[in-house]
């Protein structure tokens, strides 16, 4: 079976993990954590990067940092992973879902302002497939209405919008290093990017269980104590060691994924020109990271038939999110603002193909040939 995904392995992970074990410090904020954070701060030009156990934890940390309260409203797309919404629902917020653009599957920036009320506190754009939302417009709306922007850049590590790294444009950015992402911290992991310097000190406190422990270890205070609400949002240094191996190879991983992505695009473009499928759209201002390659079929039935065809050929291709607003929790905790023109319809057409760093060219060719044979 050709899998849909396999975690990236570059070859130096075990050496670094053994080094972490030999250091005598396996908990958070060890040497490998500092290396990873500094690398991202310099590479992506973020004021402060803090490793977390997951992107879910990073989003929860953002909700705490913005002091989201019961009754507050947070705007986001419905076509996203449940963690995007849950982080704010846990604080008592009401989620306001906005329709997506069919070209990028990202939130439609032209519909955001109409969804704003006097209860709105934040906008959470989700960079689907590592392709940027229209951030200039979103940031202008946020500034006009005095709102925070939290970028869910779980899929966006190494992608850019007008030359700026995704996750560094909003007030806060959230990365994922889950095993399904381009880079992993040994299976689970994330990072919070603090781009508003006024939020940095409190972010460190919230991440360290509500204490000023980080200041204590830097020698800024002679003891640390409970200062604020918080939780344990540190990544173990053993995981950071795995991640460091991946970040050292980040450019190599990125180029390989882009090559695989382009191979799919070139091979399937004739089908798109013939009107049999639709291919991903990359806007001119966006540089993507080849996180995902998807095609769109005519409808849900057509997609189901193709999934079965590929499965018969020992190829695993998968659909993606069920829109949150149609779920029981989405109905309880959220509201869809305006018309659902594209969210549900487009989600039922989208099919993701196998794409991962270690995908062998012969296996990718098998996927392509099987697809071409399906369409005759």
Model-derived segments and spans:
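N-terminal "arm"/small-domain region of PLP-dependent enzymes with the aminotransferase-like
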Residues: 1-26, 225-227, 354
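Structural detector of well-ordered beta-strand residues that form the stable sheet scaffold
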Residues: 50, 75, 96, 149-150, ...
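PLP-dependent aminotransferase-like
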Residues: 64-153, 160
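Hydrophobic/aromatic ligand-binding patch that stacks against planar heteroaromatic rings
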Residues: 86-88, 141, 165, 182, ...
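Active-site PLP attachment segment
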Residues: 168-212, 237
